[in-house]
Every structure is written in structure tokens, then in C-alpha cells.
Amino acid sequence: MKPESRQAVAHFLTAAGRELNAFLEGLEADDYKAAVQMIRESRRGGGRVHVTGIGKPGHVAGYMASLLSSTGTPAYFLHGTEAVHGSCGQLVAGDVVICIS
């Protein structure tokens, strides 16, 4: 690997690590626990998780829905724009919606 490529990778990883640390510092433990509890209760009642976002957050939402689904939590990606044009019909009482901005 060229030195400038190695330097670019190091710069990216440093920036990504800094952003991840800032994100983790901003998490409120009680809020996180409440969200997890909400998802658990929904699941027990037969509910599902819908994750939504538009643009880059939409890509993250799709990936998050996929991760949840592959680990046993019924989850779906709900496109933020299409949701207001009829796609909300897939939501039922007891479901949880996670919005990513």
C-alpha cells in the first residue's frame, strides 16, 4: 500500500472513531433501555419494527432493518417518502417505528 493511501485510511479511521465516540457519549442509557424495552414488548405482542429514513439515513435504516431481521426481530424498511403515500398501511397497532435522521 502506498504511504498516501495508508495515510488516507488512517485519517478516515481516526475520524470515524471520533464520530463513534461522540455518538456513544450522546447516548442516554435510560433512553436506550426504553427503546429496547419497547421493541421487546412489541415483539411479545406479535408486533414488528419498521425502520425509516430518507437519503443516506434511509440506507442506514435499510441496513438496520436487515440486521434486526437477521437476528430474529421481525423488521422492515419503511421508505420515508413512500410512507406518506400509502406505505403506512403495513403498520399495525403494537408495531414500533424507528426514524433515522
Language-model region placement:
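Conserved N-terminal alpha-helical segment that immediately precedes and caps sugar-phosphate-binding
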Residues: M1-S101
